[in-house]
């Protein structure tokens, strides 16, 4: 029996998550990319188009977007349809603001970890079950393919 895989990133927003991942190879913009009523990716050019992010750990290289990102994200949080954790190669301020505002307005912790290596798709895959600590930056793969 092999031990779980542990990946050390950088903690950007505190909180803990245990659950399933949705892993994308493309940057993501929440504004016009996520339906905040359903949590489904609606950007037709995105590799996760049609996938629900609701309650999942969402892994993508970096955000693509605007200052509207936190507004869409907060609407998804309010509707119970937001990703429950975010993991990036590089998290920019608008992504981190999503987690901080979710905590401030709705008392919902959305852990964020960045600092993944560029070849993260070799380490994390859609459907993997993980534990994420947003304070320490630790990602532990519990099960997967």
PLM regions with names:
Residues 3-14, 21-140:
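Feature captures the catalytic cores and cofactor-binding loops of soluble hydro-lyases/lyases
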Residues 142-145:
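Intein/HINT protein-splicing elements and their conserved insertion hotspots or analogous self-processing inserts
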């Amino acid at each position: 029996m092999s031990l779980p895989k542990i990946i050390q990133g950088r903690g950007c927003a505190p909180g803990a998550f245990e659950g399933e991942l949705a892993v994308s190879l493309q940057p993501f913009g929440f504004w016009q990319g996520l339906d905040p009523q359903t949590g489904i990716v609606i950007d037709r050019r995105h590799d996760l188009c049609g996938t629900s992010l609701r309650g999942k750990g969402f892994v993508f290289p970096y955000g693509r977007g605007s200052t509207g990102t936190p507004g869409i994200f907060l609407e998804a949080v309010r509707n119970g349809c937001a990703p429950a954790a975010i993991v990036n190669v590089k998290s920019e301020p608008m992504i981190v603001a999503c987690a901080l505002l979710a905590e401030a307005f709705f008392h919902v912790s959305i852990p964020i970890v960045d600092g993944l290596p560029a070849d993260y798709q070799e380490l994390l895959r859609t459907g993997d079950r993980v534990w994420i600590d947003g304070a320490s930056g630790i990602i532990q793969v519990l099960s997967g393919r």
